[in-house]
Amino acid sequence: PSSTRKILPGLYLKNFQALESIIKLAQENKIKILMYNVPIRNDVKIPYKIDDYSKFKNDLDYLSKKYLFKYINLENIVPNNLWAEKTSTTLSNETEIDFMHFKEKGHEILAENIYFEIKKFWKDVN
């Protein structure tokens, strides 16, 4: 990655407060929640501070336990060879690793995992 992104504490807090409000609203309206942590490429250094990224995942897990909804971590389900590359953001014009997008097969894997969890989750709550 060309840079390491850090958590901005004020924005992070506001975003999590907003997320918590959405969770409460969903539950008030009897909407089932399945939250997942998105896939991320894991064969190279990720563009986030590891401590910040771990905190984020732990905070999602905490919310799932507090509000009793299903949370799954899918960060490692897309194989590294299925991640996309992007055009350079520097003067070098070399392609760069894209941490946000993966190829079609990666989307199929993600969809299959989410579908499996939804089927299992809805079966468990009905």
Describe every region a protein language model picked out:
Residues 1-77:
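Conserved, well-ordered alpha-helix/loop/beta-strand core segments that scaffold catalytic motifs
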Residues 53-126:
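Catalytic His-Asp segment of secreted/periplasmic serine-dependent ester chemistry enzymes
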